[in-house]
Amino acid sequence: MVMTKKVIFICGASHSGSTLLGLILGSHSACFYAGEVNKIQFLNIKKEHEDKSCKICGRSCPIWGNFILDKEFGLYKQLSKLTNKPIIIDSTKKIAWLKKQSNKLEIYQSKYLIYILRDGRAVINSQLRKYKDSDPEELIEKWIKHIKSTDDFYYNFSGKKIQIHYEALSSKPEDIIKKLCNFLEISYEKSMSQYYLHEHHPLGGNTGTHYLIIKAQKDNKKIDSPIQLSERNKYYYLDHPLEIRLDLRWKKELSEKIIKIFEKKAGKLNKSFRWND
């Protein structure tokens, strides 16, 4: 039986590229990207929920389809046993979950933390696109609160840790992937950047990024994805190449009014997140 040797946590704000990063790392032969693992709470509920199943193959998923957590055995050990992978990747954003799970790891399990940074203006734009009736000021306040708590978690994390920019990953994927492989002490595999050609079983995460896998593997009969592109995302992802590409839509979509509000409330905090204005 394969045992969990490493657990990689990916933290950051929502809509910061953690799904892309998780899928890239999960394309390594030794890794399994589980997605936002805290979504296991929705797997066995009776009512319908968007996070009730694997984002790629739906309820027939060989990993999550009949998954029942064995609390005695351990969550990540259970996933290693199911997938035959010694390295498990969890991109849950909730800090309470990350603290709990990182503290529960056994002494022989190494823990790593990757903090993915993305310009806060891009994050707010993505959130407004998804939640179009939201109050921009409320979203900005939530971003500030989450970033501060994530910064605190990162500062106090006792395992190996690193920060990377989504924009750097998307602009120079090979360089950043090699850097992360070195950090994680695993060999670099060239096919990792072609994550859309690999088998994946993530919970939660970005619908658009998952859609590119479905698009690339349209003839794979095992895929029965429950995801649907929103009207506001269709134009972007239907014509999106499979290759990794930097998303700077916020520069065209985010109004000057909202940018000014963001700068007033969060400009100082966003300094380390800004990307080549």
Question: Residue locations for each model-derived region?
Answer:
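PAPS-dependent sulfotransferase catalytic core
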Residues: 1-74, 79-82
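Hydrophobic/aromatic beta-strand patches that form the interior of the parallel beta-sheet core
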Residues: 8, 32, 112-115, 162-164
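Short, solvent-exposed loop/turn segments at secondary-structure junctions
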Residues: 15-16, 38-40, 94-97, 118-123, ...
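PAPS-dependent sulfotransferases, especially Golgi type II membrane carbohydrate sulfotransferases
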Residues: 1-8, 151-154, 186-277
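Conserved phosphate-donor/acceptor-positioning beta-strand/loop module used by diverse small-molecule
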Residues: 90-94, 101-128
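Glycine-rich phosphate-binding loop used to anchor ATP phosphates in small-molecule kinases
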Residues: 71-100
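PAPS-dependent sulfotransferase catalytic domain
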Residues: 68-74, 117-196, 204-206, 213, ...
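Acidic-histidine catalytic/liganding microenvironments
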Residues: 28-29, 92, 105, 157
